[in-house]
A protein has these predicted regions:
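Conserved C-terminal portion of the radical SAM core fold
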Residues: 1-18, 25-56, 97
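A generic membrane alpha-helix/interface feature
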Residues: 18-20, 62
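Alpha-helix N-cap and loop-to-helix initiation/capping positions
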Residues: 20-28, 82, 119
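Short, basic, helix/turn surface patches
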Residues: 22-34, 160-170
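Radical SAM enzyme core and accessory elements
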Residues: 57-171
């Protein structure tokens, strides 16, 4: 799966410079490739490469000598996609709990831990920011590489429940 990069001295570069073509951002490309990889995985189709291999010419557009003018270039693009997929798996598992989750423990194989945690802990930070969930990651060599388990370790108490308990204690 190769997101489109604008390469120097191509027709696409001209269209880009003439503002007739707008490349995807890295975030947009990760989201698109994540959906494609999920679809292929469900069909049992192995994805052997995601994103162009880094070379002297195919590298960050900001580096001198790069032939890439614009587009969703990242030297570890596949890992960004895989980490986004693991984030979605964790969120899906958390949403299945019929409770207000305050803290979870994620159990993973040590080979998978980087995908679960995310680049610069982004997945952990997003869980805290968007779902107000604290995360403890436990590594277990017994877990298969692709498997993760999410266990609720703390729940938020409903303020109405707390008020009812206080009232019944006062009686």
């Amino acid at each position: 799966i190769y997101p489109v990069l604008v390469i120097k001295n191509t027709r696409l570069e001209k269209e880009f410079l003439d503002e007739k073509y707008t490349p995807l951002t890295v975030v947009q490309a990760v989201e698109t490739c994540k959906e494609l990889m999920s679809m292929f995985n469900q069909k049992g189709i192995e994805v052997i490469r995601v994103g162009l291999q880094n070379t002297d010419e195919i590298t960050d557009p900001n580096i001198e000598g790069s032939e890439v003018v614009a587009g969703p270039y990242h030297e570890t693009f596949r890992q960004l996609v895989e980490r986004a997929m693991y984030y979605d798996m964790v969120v899906e598992k958390i949403k299945k709990f019929n409770t207000k989750v305050k803290e979870v423990e994620i159990r993973v194989n040590p080979q998978t831990v980087n995908n679960v945690v995310g680049y610069k802990r982004q997945n952990i930070e997003k869980l805290k920011e968007f779902y107000d969930v604290d995360v403890i990651v436990k590594q277990d060599i017994k877990y298969p590489v692709e498997k993760i388990d999410v266990v609720v370790t703390k729940e938020y108490k409903d303020f109405l429940e707390e008020d009812e308990k206080e009232l019944s204690m006062k009686k």
